[in-house]
Curated annotation (Swiss-Prot):
<feature type="coiled-coil region">
    <location>
        <begin position="65"/>
        <end position="89"/>
    </location>
</feature>
<keyword id="KW-0970">Cilium biogenesis/degradation</keyword>
<dbReference type="GO" id="GO:0005737">
    <property type="term" value="C:cytoplasm"/>
</dbReference>
<protein>
    <recommendedName>
        <fullName>Coiled-coil domain-containing protein 15</fullName>
    </recommendedName>
</protein>
<keyword id="KW-0963">Cytoplasm</keyword>
<dbReference type="GO" id="GO:0060271">
    <property type="term" value="P:cilium assembly"/>
</dbReference>
<keyword id="KW-0175">Coiled coil</keyword>
<feature type="coiled-coil region">
    <location>
        <begin position="638"/>
        <end position="669"/>
    </location>
</feature>
<comment type="function">
    <text>Plays an important role in primary cilium assembly, maintenance, and length regulation. Interacts with centriole inner scaffold proteins to promote proper centriole size and integrity and assembly of functional cilia. Required for the recruitment of both the inner scaffold protein POC1B and the distal SFI1/CETN2 complex to centrioles.</text>
</comment>
<keyword id="KW-0206">Cytoskeleton</keyword>
<dbReference type="GO" id="GO:0005814">
    <property type="term" value="C:centriole"/>
</dbReference>
<comment type="subunit">
    <text>Interacts with POC5, POC1B, CETN2 and FAM161A.</text>
</comment>
<dbReference type="InterPro" id="IPR037693">
    <property type="entry name" value="CCDC15"/>
</dbReference>
<dbReference type="GO" id="GO:0005813">
    <property type="term" value="C:centrosome"/>
</dbReference>
<feature type="coiled-coil region">
    <location>
        <begin position="160"/>
        <end position="189"/>
    </location>
</feature>
<dbReference type="GO" id="GO:0034451">
    <property type="term" value="C:centriolar satellite"/>
</dbReference>
<dbReference type="GO" id="GO:1903724">
    <property type="term" value="P:positive regulation of centriole elongation"/>
</dbReference>
């Protein structure tokens, strides 16, 4: 250019710094940008710590400020955490203190309640036993003191004051309890020989008829109150601090509690023969022990003008020993004057035969006036105060030990010149003064007829047993009624002295039923659960007096049927009069016979029903057994069928495989057969053209076969050469032998190969040239003698390439 002026260069733009690193920007802009961005922890790679007073690059200053802020935040967090922990600890301590105060308050309330209970029952004589601990050994355990941990010491002064106040109150309560126990100890235990004094001031004895119920109830109530108070005192008073101070306190204890007496009574009931050692003079007196209400109106017997002499009863019962005082309470069962004594059949046979101790038995003849007869429920003996003028002079009187007759028997006392008395004649001996025990038992069950005794020929000749008459006796002849006529007329007595015992007939001339009729059970025995029990057949009348008093006869409690209630009442009414007209007696006998026939029909019906029921049960059991057997057989056959199905499946599969094999063999056989047929068949002579075609075809097939074999051989040889090539290459690398490259297709000697070289290379598809080059290189190379293995491998490799079959192909 003219003038030699150089071209003007554009000045470079100054480097733009970031906004955060530009010191020319105001601090307000930096603050706004800092508020937008989140706080970033500085990285030590490019941020260096700077001194507080150093004013340099703003980036260093901002990093320092951020670090300080982070430290301040961590400090505030730790401070808030410590403050929260202190608050939690404070609240926990307050909760513990509040719970302790509540526990102390509850203990104080419990102590006040114990004090009020102790003051309320301090006047009772049976508070607790001698060894019962009223106070535990530790007062703190009684008041439930809460033991605080040693670390909690806040507010100990207030708590100590409260504990001291509570201890003073507990001490005052202990003093009150001490006074109450001393008052209890002031009572004395009553002597064993006297009647115990109850808390209400009464005496436990045999009261009169009017006061019997309340006395028994009060005794039971006192026993229950004593047991309940004893348990409550044992549970409430837990302190044992004053146990030694009150160890001398005595308990007012009854000689024999009610439970012991009841157990003794039950033992005596279950073992009636344990009273054999009772004195003979005490065995003649019996007590009425059953006071059951009647179960039907037909069993009610009126006893007129029964005057209970309670004043005569009480002195006899005051001397009863404590072991049988509870039994003595139940022995008075008579009603006041003017009331009718109702007797019934008890439902519980166990209570019907209670035998009491000889010390508690009373003279039952004191209950009745001199002109009344009291009928017992279990005996047929006459009372002790009936007129004795009904006995003729010619009657034989039994000795003293035969005065008490057994239960359920019609005792007929015969004169000297007579063997039997009539059925309606019931005579009373002079010395029969003592009724049997259980005088409230007056009626047998209506369905129950007396059975014949086995040893009737061993009895005394003057005593007629209860079943001596073989006819069916009426109900009135089995029981002694209280309205018996005292002046018996001897002209109405019918004497059957010439007839033997087995041929007795009734008033109408009918023959007596045989023994087999009475040996069967009544129908009602089969209706009851205990239907297999009969009355004992052994008669106690021939036994000595001690054994007679100990006979334990059980009374069946069957109710009579409703349809014969009126008939039984009428029979019972007629049986009360000894002197009946013959017509009424015949009516009674006919009705009696009708009732017996009804019982026999009922017996047969019940037996048939029982047999039908038993047969039904057997049929049901047989049905269940057949059902079980059917189910067993069904399971067995089902298993057999399953096995058969499995076997059939196996057979079918085997058959299918056999068919498949047969089909294949058949096809092969058919092909062979067709071939043989074609060979054996006569064909037309071939023409020359056809023969030449066949030969050409055969040649082509041979060439094709040879070519396939050659290709297979070449493939195997190529694989062998490649393996040998890899082996030589590895060994040469192992011995650090480096060969020069054969061509320019690769930098290495092994890169030259006819299959991999380029199409402009001399070795491309030229196996012969490659083999010559390879042999020349191997032969010109100097391999040490020590590498004999490598040398042999290289020679084999070269010879293999020399024999490459592709040489002939190319």
């Amino acid at each position: 250019m003219p003038g030699g002026m150089a071209p003007l260069k554009k000045p470079r733009n100054p480097t733009k710094l970031p906004l955060a690193l530009n010191p020319t920007k105001s601090k307000d802009v930096l603050a706004v940008l800092a508020e937008r961005n989140q706080a970033i922890i500085p990285v030590g790679a490019w941020v260096e710590p700077a001194s507080p007073n150093w004013s340099g690059i703003p980036a260093h200053t901002s990093a320092y400020v951020v670090e300080e802020e982070i430290k301040e935040q961590q400090r505030r967090k730790q401070e808030s955490l410590r403050h929260f922990q202190r608050q939690v600890r404070h609240r926990v301590n307050q909760r513990v203190k509040l719970r302790k105060k509540q526990q102390l308050h509850k203990s104080y309330k419990a102590a006040e309640k114990e004090g009020s209970i102790a003051m309320q029952y301090s006047d009772l004589a049976h508070l607790s036993s001698k060894r019962t601990s009223v106070f535990p050994s530790n007062l703190n355990a009684a008041v439930g003191r809460f033991r605080l941990p040693t670390s909690q010491v806040l507010g100990d002064a207030i708590e100590d004051g409260e504990n001291q106040l509570f201890q003073q109150q507990a001490q005052a309560l202990s003093q009150t309890m001490k006074q109450a126990r001393h008052q209890l100890a002031s009572f004395k235990t009553v002597s064993e020989k006297k009647t115990p004094v109850l808390p209400n001031g009464g005496r436990k004895g045999c009261p009169t008829q009017e006061g019997l119920g309340c006395g028994k109830i009060s005794f039971v109530a006192v026993s229950e109150e004593r047991d309940a108070l004893f348990v409550s005192c044992q549970q409430d008073f837990l302190s044992e601090d004053k146990e030694k101070a009150f160890s001398k306190v005595q308990k007012v204890k009854f000689k024999n509690p009610l439970s012991v007496v009841i157990k003794e009574d039950e033992r005596k009931q279950l073992h009636p023969h344990s009273l054999q050692a009772v004195l003979p003079e005490a065995q003649d007196y019996f007590v009425e022990v059953q006071s059951g209400l009647p179960e039907s109106q037909s069993d009610v017997i009126d006893v007129q003008n029964v005057e209970p002499k309670a004043s005569r009863i009480e002195p006899k019962t005051l001397g009863v020993e404590p072991d049988t005082q509870a039994t003595g309470v139940e022995c008075q069962t008579t009603e006041p004057e003017g009331q009718a004594v109702k007797t019934g059949i008890q439902d519980v046979p166990k209570v019907q035969t209670v035998e009491l101790d000889g010390n508690t038995e009373l003279e039952a003849q004191d209950f009745l006036p001199s002109h009344q007869a009291f009928l017992s429920r279990d005996t047929d003996c006459l009372p002790n105060c009936q007129y004795q003028d009904s006995l003729p002079k010619g009657h034989c009187v039994l000795p003293n030990y035969w005065n008490v007759l057994p239960k359920y028997q019609n005792q007929h006392f015969l004169p000297v010149d007579q063997e039997f008395l009539p059925r309606n004649q019931l005579a009373l001996p002079k010395e029969q003064n003592h009724p049997l025990q259980c005088q409230k038992q007056d009626l047998l069950p209506r369905e129950q007829f007396p059975l014949l005794l086995r040893h009737q020929d061993q009895r005394e000749p003057h005593v007629l047993p209860k079943c001596q008459e073989h006819d069916v006796l009426s109900k009135a002849q089995n029981y002694l009624h209280n309205y018996q006529e005292q002046d018996l007329q001897l002209q109405n007595q019918e004497v059957n002295s010439k007839e033997p015992l087995s041929d007795i007939t009734d008033g109408k001339g009918r023959e007596i039923f045989s023994l087999d009729m009475f040996s069967k059970k009544p129908s009602t025995f089969m209706r009851r659960e205990r239907g297999d029990e009969e009355l004992p057949l052994d008669s106690p009348q021939c036994a000595p007096p001690q054994i007679q008093d100990q006979v334990f006869l059980r009374e069946q409690s069957q109710q009579p049927s409703v349809r014969t209630a009126e008939r039984w009442q009428e029979d019972l009414y007629l049986s009360g009069h000894e002197c009946l007209p013959p017509r009424q007696r015949r009516d009674t006998c006919s009705r009696q016979q009708q009732v017996y026939e009804e019982y026999r029909s009922g017996l047969s019906t019940e037996q048939q029903a029982l047999l039908a029921f038993q047969s039904g049960v057997d049929q049901e059991e047989d049905k269940k057994e057949r059902q079980k057997q059917y189910l067993r057989h069904r399971r067995l056959f089902m298993d057999i069928e399953r096995e058969q199905v499995k076997e059939q499946n196996r057979q079918r599969e085997r058959k299918r495989r056999i068919e498949k094999i047969k089909k294949k063999k058949e096809q092969q056989r058919y092909a062979e057969e067709q071939r043989l047929l074609r060979m054996n068949c006569h064909e037309e002579p071939y023409s020359e053209e056809k023969i030449s075609d066949v030969l050409a075809q055969l040649q082509l097939e041979e060439i094709k076969g040879a070519r396939e074999k050659q290709q297979q051989r070449e493939k195997e040889y190529i694989r062998y050469v490649e393996a040998l090539r890899a082996q030589v290459q590895e060994k040469m690398k192992l011995y650090n032998i480096t060969l020069p490259p054969l061509c320019c297709c690769g930098p290495d000697f092994w890169d030259a190969h006819p299959d991999t070289c380029a199409n402009n290379c001399i070795f491309y598809k030229n196996y012969r040239a490659y083999n010559r080059a390879l042999h020349s290189v191997i032969n010109s190379s100097d391999i040490s003698e020590g590498n004999a293995t490598l040398r042999n491998a290289i020679r084999n490799f070269a010879s293999a390439h020399r024999r490459t079959p592709k040489q002939s192909l190319h």
